UniProtKB/Swiss-Prot annotation:
Its EC number is 1.13.11.54, 1.13.11.53. Ni(2+) binds at residues 97, 99, 103, 141. It comes from Xanthomonas campestris pv. campestris (strain ATCC 33913 / DSM 3586 / NCPPB 528 / LMG 568 / P 25). One of its GO terms (biological process) is L-methionine salvage from methylthioadenosine. Keywords: Amino-acid biosynthesis, Dioxygenase, Iron, Metal-binding, Methionine biosynthesis, Nickel, Oxidoreductase. Pfam families: ARD. Transmembrane segments: none annotated. The lineage of its organism: Bacteria, Pseudomonadati, Pseudomonadota, Gammaproteobacteria, Lysobacterales. Catalyzes 2 different reactions between oxygen and the acireductone 1,2-dihydroxy-3-keto-5-methylthiopentene (DHK-MTPene) depending upon the metal bound in the active site. Fe-containing acireductone dioxygenase (Fe-ARD) produces formate and 2-keto-4-methylthiobutyrate (KMTB), the alpha-ketoacid precursor of methionine in the methionine recycle pathway. Ni-containing acireductone dioxygenase (Ni-ARD) produces methylthiopropionate, carbon monoxide and formate, and does not lie on the methionine recycle pathway. Monomer. Belongs to the acireductone dioxygenase (ARD) family. It catalyses: 1,2-dihydroxy-5-(methylsulfanyl)pent-1-en-3-one + O2 = 3-(methylsulfanyl)propanoate + CO + formate + 2 H(+); 1,2-dihydroxy-5-(methylsulfanyl)pent-1-en-3-one + O2 = 4-methylsulfanyl-2-oxobutanoate + formate + 2 H(+). Its cofactor is Fe(2+); Ni(2+). Fe(2+) binds at residues 97, 99, 103, 141. This is Acireductone dioxygenase.
Amino acid sequence: MSRLRIFADSNPTTPHFDSRDGEQIATELRKIGVTFERWHASQPVEPGASPEQVMAAYRADIDRISAERGFKTVDVVSIAPDNPKREEMRAKFLDEHFHKEDEVRFFVAGSGLFTLHVDAQVYEIECVKDDLIAVPDSTLHWFDMGPEPHFVAIRFFTEPDGWVGHFTGTEIAKQFPRYAPEKPPKAS
């Protein structure tokens, strides 16, 4: 389930806002220019679906947001817990950085944690299946896919080289807990 927690950047242990309600999440994020939406597939997406099948299932929303925001390229990324480069991939964006274009991701499956640092506040957004998040360019943030990453996401780009992280060199990301998604209870 999606979740937004907001902290003062000086207090990483106690959020002053905590919600799993999609409308409340969208409302709070809108205040800082971030888009949060829920999408639904126009056709079933089976595990192991090809990128083309994934994009076909969400074609109307992909076309809408691409037209609204001027995206030129869309792709599908899939990360599994058994990926031999998972630790390297996780570490790549764990520190505070920004991009020179909007970072827009739609979670087809799985989950990840976007953490935004805006105006002395830290916004921790757990994105799950059916969530779209659009982080404006130059927004300070970090992303954690967890120790056993599992997600399929549609990514949107305006420039082929725009999705380059520009790191701030601050230690703030290390002050906040890393992502550890809740695991469903085991069947007995």
